[in-house]
């Protein structure tokens, strides 16, 4: 029963956050991948082994090296590299304080790549987490900021998050990143855990 209530609370909180985000979010965004197709391989708030997925995973046609685009004008506010988790990741923050997270990248654009390589050389470690100021690495909407990859994960895809001004994840599908879905869901079973 406790588990059921916790799950219910999380679902309601995420829905409320998504509705709040959609009400205050700008819709003038571009798709984060330079692809004609828009398919998901993972959805927002899917259960993932004891946690919820706070992003959408975008299909890259089983390839790496697809140009990844800045969805809004803003700046690269954070660069992370790790052999696991997000792998190579960029955080783009816009003027309104919204943050867009791109993870599992193969290669970063020149400016962020030079910044993270300098940090890696100075620390002697591959795993780095570099926070940047508003004027450090500005980007324009539609600019190529990276290439898609599979770092930190098994299969190639783009893990894409939208976070509000408080840093809370919101549903990207309600924030201008919708995909056309013409297949109605079919409920095959319902399971309740106690």
Regions found by a protein language model. Give the residues of each.
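Positively charged n-region of N-terminal signal peptides that target proteins for export
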Residues: 1-4
């Amino acid at each position: 029963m406790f588990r059921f209530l916790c799950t219910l609370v999380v679902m309601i909180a995420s829905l409320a956050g998504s509705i709040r985000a959609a009400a205050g979010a700008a819709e003038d965004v571009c798709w984060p991948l330079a692809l004609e197709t828009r398919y998901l391989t993972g959805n927002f708030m899917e259960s993932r082994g004891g946690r919820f997925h706070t992003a959408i995973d975008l299909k890259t046609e089983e390839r790496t090296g697809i140009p990844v685009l800045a969805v809004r004008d803003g700046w690269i506010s954070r660069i992370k590299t790790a052999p696991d988790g997000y792998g190579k990741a960029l955080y783009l923050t816009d003027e309104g304080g919204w943050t867009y997270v791109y993870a599992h990248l193969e290669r970063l654009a020149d400016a962020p790549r030079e910044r993270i390589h300098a940090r890696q050389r100075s620390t002697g470690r591959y795993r780095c987490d570099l926070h940047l100021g508003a004027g450090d690495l500005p980007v324009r909407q539609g600019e190529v900021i990276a290439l898609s990859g599979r770092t930190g994960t098994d299969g190639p895809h783009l893990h894409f998050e939208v976070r509000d001004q408080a840093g809370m994840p919101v549903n990207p599908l309600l924030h201008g990143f919708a995909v056309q879905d013409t297949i109605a869901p079919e409920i095959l079973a319902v399971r309740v855990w106690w």
